[in-house]
Regions:
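Long compositionally biased, domain-poor regions of proteins
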Residues: 3-52, 80-93
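Negatively charged, low-complexity tracts enriched in Asp/Glu with abundant Ser/Thr
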Residues: 9, 13, 60-71
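Phenylalanine-focused residue identity feature
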Residues: 3, 43-44, 71, 82, ...
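Extended intrinsically disordered, low-complexity coil regions enriched in Ser, Thr, Gly, Ala
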Residues: 37-64, 113-123
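Short, hydrophobic/π-rich interface segment
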Residues: 65-87
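Acidic, proline/glycine-rich low-complexity IDRs
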Residues: 1, 101-134
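Elongated alpha-helical scaffolds
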Residues: 94-98
């Protein structure tokens, strides 16, 4: 399988995982993954049809009466997929990214971008990273 085919496969898996985590009809998903060799975080927001209001992923268990443990397991699967995506870059002798913006729509439009910022060296905490992209 070529690098592009592997990317496409992982992109599909990530989009499907997130889609399966949202128990209602949604329109757009905005995802950020921050991963380095020491760990990381992944979070996403989504919109519902007819609304531009962002719905934060951590509200899903409470809002839709879903087990927190089940949701955490799904989130860990999502995190693992982003780690797999980062590892693919290493396997291809490419610089591993530290930030991945992964946005997609219900219609199948996908926008993926990567950054190579040393967040720790620059002193950005979680909210600083989020504000960097606002």
């Amino acid at each position: 399988m070529t690098f592009e085919e592997k990317l496409s496969k992982i992109y599909n898996e990530i989009a499907n995982e997130i889609s399966n985590m949202i128990p209602v009809e949604w329109e757009k998903v905005y995802t950020m993954a921050y991963i380095d060799d020491g760990g990381g975080e992944v979070f996403f927001n989504y919109t519902k049809p007819g609304s531009d209001d962002l719905n934060y992923y951590t509200d899903i268990p409470k809002e839709y009466n879903i087990s927190v443990q089940v949701f955490d397991d799904l989130w860990m699967d999502l995190y693992d997929l982003f780690e797999e995506l980062r590892d693919l870059f290493k396997e291809e002798d490419l610089e591993p990214w530290t930030s991945c913006e992964f946005d997609f729509t219900r219609e199948g439009n996908l926008k993926v971008s990567f950054d190579y910022i040393d967040w720790i060296k620059l002193g950005f905490g979680p909210s600083g990273k989020e504000n960097y992209y606002m």
